[in-house]
Amino acid sequence: MKTKITSLLGASIIASTSLAQVSPVISSWLRNTTGITGRHYVSGNSTPINDSYLANVQSVKYSTNFVYVSCTGIPSYVIGPYLDGNPNQGGNNSNIYKIPLVPVANTGSLSPTTGGTIGVFINGVSLFDYRDGVSWKSSTSSLCGGPIMPPCTGDGVWNRDAVVAERAGFDCAKGHPAMTNYHHHQNPSAFNLDLTVISSICNLYASDALYVINSSVHSPIIGYAYDGFPIYGAYGYKNADGSGGIVRMKSSFSLRSITTRNTLYTSTATVTPGPAVSTTYPLGYFKEDYQYVPTTTLTPDYLDIHNGRFCVTPEYPLGTYCYFATVDANHNSAYPYVVGPTFYGVKNVSKVTSITETTTTYTGSATTSLQTINLDAAINIYPNPSADLIMIQSKELLSHDLKVELSNLTGQIVAKKDFYQGSTICYFETTGLYNGTYFLTIIDNGIKKSFKVIINN
């Protein structure tokens, strides 16, 4: 079966890349065409600070075999603060990613994911796997390792899950920095947009993150893994052939039924013990608390051991292997989160210091505009009637800036905002406005669309 899938995969990708200018691995990147720079919060100040370095992707170039993505590693959405004491702040990392046009399935020994960058999101931000470099040290009955606990080294048997253990240190967009390398370990949607909100960070430090989960449509490509295969958001077609409707793609990993940590799910042999399961170290605190239950033909919406599957997607109508950013029914991140614990393909994406072959620069036109999207379906304005705040949410990533104006019944403009490229949310504070009817107008190069809103403070 794997041979058949591999051959189909190769055919589909070759078909999709025969015209390189329309290949998703070239056209999916969020290029900075407006000069937008990064922004960040510091603790105690909910007004974003403008940074000097550019956000998103600066250029996309391609050759016969590779795509080169140049980026700072900084998104256009506001990042920070990190309330667990993390002293770092994201900065310009001057990355050039070299990605194969045709990724290759690994038919030999699988490559495990590692610490550090294991993929790149479409805005140039790094993807990390579950880990934070901390593990249990049995001889001292304590956690060791990671950037904040050197030079202590753990046993490397019970490895801490950053998504669980470092939640207090994630910003509203579910990211944080390692030195200047801002990154996500998990589905990059904002905490306050989850169906069950498990962090209050967005209350003071709002950010829209990379994309908004929409359960009614197939999620977009949100990145590429270090084996060159695409990463999608949380939702896809139920069946691999594109049938069955839109469903949440589910992880095939589940928590083990254990109270002591002295074995791994792959064997009954005793290993160096970790701490007993407790409120301090609950199930899920360590990666080894999970077990993999293989999916079957009866559960096509459950993913394989790499957190992906071969399937049809909107961008790959002939099919491709792809990963999904998994969430649970409450839209909270679900292990193994994006990619892992091993890659499906040959790990062949790299960072390079320069481009040493002849390339073509991709200059594809922006596609997300008032001319190309149905605003009534793609824009959500809430709450309406509004008290304190009006949120404008786009279900698609904006590929260029829009202007937004709020005016009263006499036509007087009472507030203006920029809806930035790469954003999905823009908002107005309304506490200083009189109650009544207003019009919210979105403007794109002279084309306007207005919505009626009610303010009732």
Kindly give the residue locations of the regions a language model identified.
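Solvent-exposed N-terminal domain segments of exported/luminal and surface proteins
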Residues: 21-171
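C-terminal outer-membrane/trafficking sorting elements
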Residues: 371-382, 386-457
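Low-complexity, Pro/Thr/Ser/Gly/Ala-rich linker/spacer regions in secreted
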Residues: 360-376
